[in-house]
């Protein structure tokens, strides 16, 4: 915890057993001692009872219910702020149902770019991966596309709703024609 403090956020998974009855309390104590709070730490577990204990001890920490199977009626569980679901069970309907309740979906384990892209298309909020470089590269490329689309939208708005004299309409028409005929070149130029 000392090495992580100030460098990265944590997703702490609690795996309770009969031999560790105070595991939730000890986990919360250590997180607080090392300066981890709700801004840089979430607590997850496959045990809903564990999440309930954490919320009683430290309601400020976001808690995630880890679901090996993304089926059932779990959306309204009060002690789960988000759901961590294996990618096979994530559907757009499930993501929408969770989002309608003001909660989020984390997908695990993302180790292929194709799977990461699919999860982003479904609207998941977080990608849990063993290959952070791959996910960072994908997110950076997606951001570049988003920025280009925003620039394109702004340019089209400026062309379609000019605040300049009407004599600039020939230029606007030519620019729109160029964009329609060769959108990739137009976006690259923007």
Show where each model-derived region lies:
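Short loop-to-alpha-helix "cap/lid" segments that border enzyme active sites
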Residues: 2-170, 182-189
